[in-house]
Amino acid sequence: MMRIRPTVHLGAFGYGNLGDELCLIEAMQAFPSAEAYAFSVAPDWTMRCVPCLKGCFRNAGEMLALKPARVVYGGGLFGTSKAFQAWIPSLVRAKAMGAEVYFHNLGVGALGDLGWLSAAERSVIEDAAIFTVRDYVSVERWAKAGISRMPYVTHFPEADIAPEFSLADALLPRGQRLLGVSIIPTPMMRACLRHEAATVHALMEEFSDHAIVPIVSTVHLSTPDEDDTAGCIEFLRDFLPKNPIAAPILLDREFWRAELTPQRLKGLIARCDTLLTHRKHNAVHGIGANVRVIGLHPWADGSLRRTFIALSDRLPHGSRCIGLQAPST
C-alpha cells in the first residue's frame, strides 16, 4: 500500500501565542490534506489547539523524515531573517525530494537585504507554488529584500475561522454588557499608559456599566513581556478597578494552558459588546465576529494599526484604533 505523503506546516507554533495556532488552523483549511504535521516547540499544546493535526515535529530533520508532498511556510510573523536562515536550507532539501513549497499569509518583519541567500535558496522562494502575505506593509518590506518574486495580499483570512462557544457558554453571564480587555505588558505600553492615563481614563468612562472579560491570547513560554494575564490585571487595576470581572478564571495561567484554543478565544470575544485590544490577532477575531473593536497601542508601534487598515472594509460600526504617545526622553 502506497504511503500518503503529508503536508507539513512551518510557523512559530507552541510558544504560547494562540494567534500563531490560529494561523495554522487557517493554513490547514487553505491546504487540506489527509495527513498534516506542524513544527512545534510544545507539540502537546499545539495539538490540543489544533486537534486535526496528525502530529508535530521539532526540527528540520524530523520534518524531512516525513518526506512531505507539500511544505507550507507561514504561521503569522514567520517572515523574518532569523526564520529564513533557520528553515530555507531545509526547504531546498524538501524541494529536491519532490515537495511543493508554499509561502502563505506571512507577516513580514524588517528583513533587510536577503543577498546572503544562495542561488538554490533564492529559487525556493522565486519558484514557490504560492507566495502570499497578510498586508501591504509586508509587501513593502518584501520589496526591499532584493527578491524578484512579489507576493499577493491575503488580508488576514484567519478572520473567518469559526468560533467555538463551549467556554463562553460555560463562563459568561447572559444579559450583562461585556467588555473584552487584552493588553500586552511591554515596557513601551506600560510607559504609554502611564503617560496618557488621562486619555485612557476618559475612554473607559463609556464602560462603567460593563463586566470585564479577560482576553488572554498569549502566555509566552519564555518572554515575560508577552504575558497577557499580567497586562490585563495591571490595566484593570489602573483603569477599571470597580468593574466586575465576568470570568476571573480566564486570568489563571494553568486554566488558560489547559482550556484555551484559538476558536474558544474567538467564542469569548464574539460574546463581548466591545473588545479593547492591544494584540492584533484579537482584533482579527473581533472584526471577524462583527464585534466593535477599539485598538489601543503605542503610537511608535504600528503593527495593530496596519491590521485595522488591512481589514478596513469590514470594520464593525464604532471600531477605531488609538495610538498612545510615550513620554519624551
Regions found by a protein language model. Give the residues of each.
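Active-site anion-handling motifs in enzyme catalytic cores
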Residues: 1-329
